[in-house]
Amino acid sequence: MKILVDENMPYARELFSRLGEVKAVPGRPIPVAELDDADALMVRSVTKVNETLLAGKGIKFVGTATAGTDHVDDAWLAKAGIGFSAAPGCNAIAVVEYVFSSLLMLGERDGFALQDRTVGIVGVGNVGGRLQKRLEAMGIRTLLCDPPRADRGDEGDFRSLDELVEHADVITFHTPLFKDGAYKTFHLADETLIRRLKPGAILINACRGPVVDNAALLKCLEEGQNLSVVLDVWEPEPDLNVALLNRVDVATAHIAGYTLEGKARGTTQVFEAYSAFIGNAQQVALDTLLPAPEFGRITLHGPLDESSLKRLVHLVYDVRRDDALLRKVAGIPGEFDKLRKNYLERREWSSLYVICDDADAAALLNNLGFNAVHNPAR
C-alpha cells in the first residue's frame, strides 16, 4: 500500500508508516506521476484535489489535514467512490490565538483596551465559537453573525451582518468559502460593506482570501479610509497583491492556523480516519508526539490585566514576527510558499504552564486556554 503525504505535514511519515509505504511529496505543484501507483493521498490546502488530478488513478482515499475543504471537490470524490476525510477544528485554537495576538498588538500600538471594544464575529463554528468564549471570558462584548446557524434555529443570539457593521469596532471573518448559493461568502466583505465600517474599525480575515474583496479593500485604503486591517489570507494566493500588503497593518502568509499542535491535530485526524477506512482503526494521543516547548513554566504575581496578558501571549506567539517575515519577501516568486513550508515552530498557549498566586488570575488564564495553576504565595 502506497500513501502519498504532503511533505509539510508534521508526523505524517511517522504515523502513516504504520499502515503502509509512505512517500512525502510537495503539495504545490504535486508530482502527478507519483499518483499512478498510490492508494491514498494526504494533502493540505495548497493542493487542488478534483477530477482533473485523480481521474483514472488508483487513489481510494483522500485526506486533507485542514479544517477547510474548498480546495477539494468532495462531490466528485463521492461520485468516484473515493473515501474522504478532512480535519475539522484542527487549527481552530491556533487561529483564535492569532486573532488575539493581532488585537493585543494593535491595542498596544494604538492605545486602546480590548475590553472597551465590541468584536463582531462572522462565522461561529469551530474558530468563531472558541473566539467568542475567550473574548467573553475577558469581559469583551461580542456580536455574532452566522446565517446558516440562525436559520437552523441553533442556540445563540445571532445578528445580521448589517448590525455588526453598524455596532462592532472589530469585525473578524471565520467562514467557509462559498462562491454561490443562499449562504454565499465570496466577497462577503465587498466595497459597500467596507465603506460602511465604523471609523477606526479593525477588519480581520483569517479564513479564506476571497471572503474579502481585496481589490475593493485596496481602493478604500488608498482613498484614505480610517481602517486597520489584519490579513492572513489573500486574493489570490500565493501571488498576493503587494500594494495591498503595503497598506495593511498585519500581513501574514496564511499561517494563522500553523501551530505545531494544530498541524499535528490535522495529521492525526486524517490518520485516524484513514486507518478506520482500511479496517485497521488506530487512535493517537497528541501529547505523545509533541516536543517540550521552548518556554515551559512561568510565575505570575498578582491579578491578570490586559497588559500582563499581552506579555504572556507574546511570550508564546507575537504576530509581528510573521508580519516582518512576509514583508521582507513580498513580491518575490515562490517566497510565500517557502515561508509556509519552512515555518518557524509556534506553540499554543496551552504549552505554557503559569503558576499564579492569585486564584482569579489562574481561573481566567485557564478559561483563555493557558495551563495555569493557583499556588498561593507563602
Swiss-Prot record:
SUPFAM superfamilies: Formate/glycerate dehydrogenase catalytic domain-like (SSF52283), NAD(P)-binding Rossmann-fold domains (SSF51735). The active site is at R208, E237, H254. It holds the Pfam family DUF3410. Pathway: Cofactor biosynthesis; pyridoxine 5'-phosphate biosynthesis; pyridoxine 5'-phosphate from D-erythrose 4-phosphate: step 2/5. NAD(+) binds at D146, T175, D232, G257. One of its GO terms (molecular function) is protein dimerization activity. One of its GO terms (biological process) is pyridoxine biosynthetic process. This is Erythronate-4-phosphate dehydrogenase. Its EC number is 1.1.1.290. Substrate binds at S45, T66, Y258. It catalyses: 4-phospho-D-erythronate + NAD(+) = (R)-3-hydroxy-2-oxo-4-phosphooxybutanoate + NADH + H(+). It is an enzyme of class 1 (oxidoreductase). Belongs to the D-isomer specific 2-hydroxyacid dehydrogenase family. PdxB subfamily. It comes from the Bacteria. The keyword Oxidoreductase applies. It is found in: Cytoplasm. GO terms for cellular component: cytosol. Keywords: Cytoplasm, NAD, Oxidoreductase, Pyridoxine biosynthesis. Catalyzes the oxidation of erythronate-4-phosphate to 3-hydroxy-2-oxo-4-phosphonooxybutanoate. Homodimer. InterPro entries: D-isomer_2_OHA_DH_cat_dom, D-isomer_DH_CS, D-isomer_DH_CS1, D-isomer_DH_NAD-bd, Erythronate-4-P_DHase, Erythronate-4-P_DHase_dimer, NAD(P)-bd_dom_sf, PdxB_dimer_sf.
